[in-house]
Amino acid sequence: MRFDIVTLFPDCFTSVLSSGLLGKALAKQIAQVNLVNPRDFTTDKHRKVDDEPYGGGVGMLMKPEPIFSAVESLPILERREVILMSPQGQTIDQPLLRELVSNYEQLVVICGHYEGVDDRVLHLVTREVSLGDFILTGGEIPAMALINGVVRLLPGTVAKTESLTAESFEEGLLDYPQYTRPANFRGWKVPDVLLSGNHAAISQWRYEQQIKRTSDRRPDLLEKWQQEKKPGSREQGSREQGEK
């Protein structure tokens, strides 16, 4: 997977791209990240990338010319998506990440800044994506989240592939509570069922905890899951857990 990140602040990505699973994935060439600064494509001596909006208004907008030039300088792979990070876009979720991994080999990610971008930039864009219903100073942090979410789904990034399918949101529910040693910490004890060695009972407990936690914290997800779940999914999961 190739990522081309169009950003006025490429240095923001340095530590993120060199650490953790993301850094390892890049080192193993599972993914490639190319940082492109639209300021490098300006033609005036001040390297101006923003200007006042027509009709008046607060703040400055990113000009279209440097963004177009930056994107048009990039190679075009056969399966390419051009994404604008925007609060008006589709919210990042696990189905979106899986779709991007399955369908594309190149993601061009444009990070807006100031009060946004000239609307004509949308002629370049095939999709707008948002981190959530709130405003940030720029698209860099949402872009980092998008890259991280996509890369960890690429084959070879996570050593144990079952770790991916057992996480929150992958089955439509939040994850169950998890514990490690010690079994008793300041009076808070690990549930007995997890110490029992009974895999079927553990699987059932985890399933029940997923339902409870999702109901308590994200009832909207539980409602969606109840509408979409397939008959037999729990029983199949229980059998798989019991066979391990």
Swiss-Prot record:
InterPro entries: Alpha/beta_knot_MTases, tRNA_m1G_MeTrfase_C_sf, tRNA_m1G_MeTrfase_TrmD, tRNA_m1G_MTases_N, tRNA_MeTrfase_TRMD/TRM10. It catalyses: guanosine(37) in tRNA + S-adenosyl-L-methionine = N(1)-methylguanosine(37) in tRNA + S-adenosyl-L-homocysteine + H(+). The keyword S-adenosyl-L-methionine applies. It is an enzyme of class 2 (transferase). It is found in: Cytoplasm. Transmembrane segments: none annotated. Pfam families: tRNA_m1G_MT. Keywords: Cytoplasm, Methyltransferase, S-adenosyl-L-methionine, Transferase, tRNA processing. Its EC number is 2.1.1.228. It comes from Trichormus variabilis (strain ATCC 29413 / PCC 7937). Its main location: cytoplasm. GO terms for molecular function: tRNA (guanine(37)-N1)-methyltransferase activity. One of its GO terms (biological process) is tRNA N1-guanine methylation. Homodimer. Specifically methylates guanosine-37 in various tRNAs. This is tRNA (guanine-N(1)-)-methyltransferase. PANTHER family: TRNA (GUANINE-N(1)-)-METHYLTRANSFERASE (PTHR46417:SF1). S-adenosyl-L-methionine binds at residues 112, 131-136. Belongs to the RNA methyltransferase TrmD family.
